[in-house]
Amino acid sequence: MTSNFSSTVAGLPRIGAKRELKFALEGYWNGSIEGRELAQTARQLVNTASDSLSGLDSVPFAGRSYYDAMLDTAAILGVLPERFDDIADHENDGLPLWIDRYFGAARGTETLPAQAMTKWFDTNYHYLVPELSADTRFVLDASALIEDLRCQQVRGVNARPVLVGPLTFLSLARTTDGSNPLDHLPALFEVYERLIKSFDTEWVQIDEPALVTDVAPEVLEQVRAGYTTLAKRGGVFVNTYFGSGDQALNTLAGIGLGAIGVDLVTHGVTELAAWKGEELLVAGIVDGRNIWRTDLCAALASLKRLAARGPIAVSTSCSLLHVPYTLEAENIEPEVRDWLAFGSEKITEVKLLADALAGNIDAAAFDAASAAIASRRTSPRTAPITQELPGRSRGSFNTRVTLQEKSLELPALPTTTIGSFPQTPSIRSARARLRKESITLEQYEEAMREEIDLVIAKQEELGLDVLVHGEPERNDMVQYFSELLDGFLSTANGWVQSYGSRCVRPPVLFGNVSRPAPMTVKWFQYAQSLTQKHVKGMLTGPVTILAWSFVRDDQPLATTADQVALALRDEINDLIEAGAKIIQVDEPAIRELLPLRDVDKPAYLQWSVDSFRLATAGAPDDVQIHTHMCYSEFNEVISSVIALDADVTTIEAARSDMQVLAALKSSGFELGVGPGVWDIHSPRVPSAQEVDGLLEAALQSVDPRQLWVNPDCGLKTRGWPEVEASLKVLVESAKQAREKIGATI
């Protein structure tokens, strides 16, 4: 008989409080450390993570993950892409035998492209997209995870293995032959039946966030049948998150599972009518995605109502992967600091609520939480603002095109980049020295001007048509603006994993947003003074600023987005006054916030489009507005991309083999567009044949008068030799394509 637990979290971060895994991975990749050292670092991190939950009575354990949980699952199931099969097994140094194929799939090799990468549901975390086919056969090998699990058991940790569930894995996979990944669902449940029986643990957790999305009834029937079989093992805990748990309960309640986890934050505490108290309800009442302190009194009241219906355990709404480790080392003004809870503070909140539910309430802690909630609610910095908004429309696109062609005088298939150029050690050093006050602001700005000199000169030498200043002064495309806008704060150590070794430090949007002074104008003016070619003004759009920040949850996102948009509108006006003829307002994250259920999508798409247009509609018709988008599965949002009414949209496309082109063609997209022809996420220089092929594919779907030639994304993370070589290929391909089409603008 499985014994219930009372307190846990859905999952834990893996990168390390000081980004230890990041640095170990990068050291291994560049050859400065051996595999044994990487393996040891990963083991130390999972031990530390388990120890952080010593006050809870059940500990989630996903093993040593070296890049991504979906990629881990593909490795365990033996379905890493076949093109990496020729990579030999790794030597026995503590890393899994398949680790080199695993890293090949994640990062690509000199000759093989990486797997596609996209956002995990509506979060800012990325996963590697599994590649399957109708002929895929699963070959189970969980030996590495089982070994890691035994190490935790030897340490006395009450660990439960955590797996990505069959429905979620297949729902997020793609096939290379057009078949439906979900056709493999019955077979994959059979594999999972063997997998979970191999764990010598009381509980096993299977994550199925796909169950909060729209799932076809016939698929839900298969899921119910599959989990009915898995439940016979005993101690099977199916966890859901990122949305209401009602559909999961309707599907899974009463089939013999030990526990079902539900998110009680994203859509609040819903009715959960299907739960009759037969299973342990793991109540995700502490927000795992955002950094605001929990209203402990309100949460406890909700938990008590649920506990009257059956057994419950207190948990987080999702894995703590999405929030920073701790507030402990942060120097944040006391008023706002009291409003916040990072990972370790959320673990404490779970413990406080579980104890209180058991009758052991910590009155002082509850009083402190109530005081913080009241302070945030009554602060002048969060008070509602009432104002009349300016218009959100420009002239017709045909009118704008005519004026812009005369103003810009660009060739056919104009070449450009997305914005950032390599953040070199000298740039990072200058920023660090400024932070430590070992150089003056004037010295720092002179160093940045020298970098801009280099970037402009390199672009002119390469023959690019529209230039950028390279953004050397920006540590991050959102954080840079957050540090210059009122209503935001930055953390010192608030790192979260974005993908693999890449970490980001999201700003905190805690109050009303405004722009006290111009933010980018002086850098644009300096860059434009160095060249006769057009230099783009570079801004980050309102939706992306929200998506990549921890955003206040005490007012509608639409209201906050409009506040950011008004600040950007002022900045655009100042850039135009300074001479900018092309201004790029990046919205790479516009799809990330798209709700997971169809019923919720129209409202989001309306306010996200409205906020972009509020930011850009003040630009005269002869000024060309660009936008850029990443990781966007355009079929779902193409009508909204058109509604943004940007003159040119650049899109990440190379890594997904130009799949975006079908959406563009079927939609009748008539605006300017630049589908990326160089995948900058893989550390390799594309061949001329590769870029020529992508550009030729683009020309078959897009009118040459609309088409721009550009990389997938910014070049911040790449090195100069690779950038120069790749851009040389890109520019030459564009020149040859111009000759073939024989067109000029």
From Swiss-Prot:
Active-site residue list: H681 (proton donor)
Top enzyme class: transferase
Entry cofactors: Zn(2+)
Cofactor note: Binds 1 zinc ion per subunit.
Residues that, per the record, bind Zn(2+): H628, C630, E652, C713
Pathway annotation: Amino-acid biosynthesis; L-methionine biosynthesis via de novo pathway; L-methionine from L-homocysteine (MetE route): step 1/1
Highest taxon of source: Bacteria
Listed EC numbers: 2.1.1.14
Family of this protein: Belongs to the vitamin-B12 independent methionine synthase family.
Function text: Catalyzes the transfer of a methyl group from 5-methyltetrahydrofolate to homocysteine resulting in methionine formation.
Protein name: 5-methyltetrahydropteroyltriglutamate--homocysteine methyltransferase
Species: Corynebacterium glutamicum (strain R)
Gene: metE
